Amino acid sequence: MSSEQYKEMVIIQKTYDMIEYAYVCMRQFPKSEKFTLAAEIKTSMYTLLKLLIAASKKYYKKTTLQEIDIELQFLKTTVRLATQLRN
């Protein structure tokens, strides 16, 4: 296994772990946010995982990596918003 393949596997595993942890955290969301903001975060995390898997299978990764960057920025923003709304 090359170091590039290993790095790809690590980031996919870390994203998987993030999703598991986020589910525990999102159980504490108020009902009003569970079906809107929490659903948006879940969708974004699944999209991120899907894009990472797709990037690991492609030879030319540039456009997929740009999509991953956009999705990750959106996920960061929604999680930050959820944190601020909680306070």
Model-predicted segments: where are they?
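Amphipathic alpha-helical assembly/interaction segments
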Residues: 1-87
